[in-house]
Amino acid sequence: MIHTRALSPALGVEVTGVENLLDETVISRCLEALTWRGVLLIRGLHLDDEAQLAFSRRLGTVLAPAGKEIFKISLDPAVQPSAEYLKSTFHWHIDDTTNEVPAKATMLTARHVAMTGGGTEFASTYAAFEALPEQEQKRYEQLRVVHSFEAAQRLTHPDPSEQEVAAWRRLRSHETSLVWQRRDGRRSLVIGATADHIVGMDPGESRAILDELLEWTAQERFRYTHEWAVDDVVIWDNTGMLHRALPYDPASRRTMHRTTIAGEEAWG
C-alpha cells in the first residue's frame, strides 16, 4: 500500500510502499503529490537508466533527443564535459527560464554521493508568494523580468573574459512575468540566478527587489534540504521550486542522472 509523509511544512513528500513503479495508481499518486507538494522523494528503488526512463515517460514526455535522455550531473569533466557550467547550480535557480515553455518536472537519481556536503535544497516559490502581504503581491504582479544564461554564469565567474561573455550572450534570453499565474490559478515567483533585471526599472532598484525576493523565498519555512543516499529518486516541479546544490569536494564522485519532463504551459 502506498503511503506519503510530508518532508517539511511547505513542500516535499516521501512516497513509500511502492511495489510497481509503473502502476497506474502509483503514477497518479505521484503526479498528484508533485502538483501539491512540489518535491517528491522515493528511496531504495535501485533504478538503472532504462527504468528511470520508463518511469519518466509515464510522468510525461521526456525532453531530450533520442539516445541522450539521461544527463549526467558531475563536476568531473571526464564524466560531464559541461562540468564548468554546472558550478552555477550552487546558486538558487529555476531551470528553463530562458525557454518559451519551461520543463514540467526534473528527476534525479543518485548514483554516487559525496562523503560530505552535496545535498540539494528546494524552496517553494508558490508558498513564498502566498505569504507576501497583499499589497506587495499586487505590485509584483505588474512587473516583468529578463532571464539570461549570462546572469547565472556571472555569479560563479565575476570577472569573465570577452570570449566567455560573447559565448554566454549567444544563448537566448527570455522575458517572463515576475509572478506567473498558471491556468489552474496558482501563482509563483519566477526568480533565481538567471533573473538579470526587471524591465523598465533602475538597475539598482531592480537588483534590490530581485535579491530581496530571493532572500524571502529561501527562508527555512519555505525550504526543504535533501541529503542524498545512493539510489534516492527525487522529482520536483521545475516551474515552482527554486533549487540549488550544496557545496561538496569537486574531487568527489558525486553523480546524479537526470531526466527532464517536457512542460505544457508557456511562461506568463
Specify the residue positions occupied by each region the protein language model found:
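Non-heme Fe(II) oxygenase catalytic core, chiefly the N-lobe of the double-stranded beta-helix
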Residues: I2-V233, N238-G268
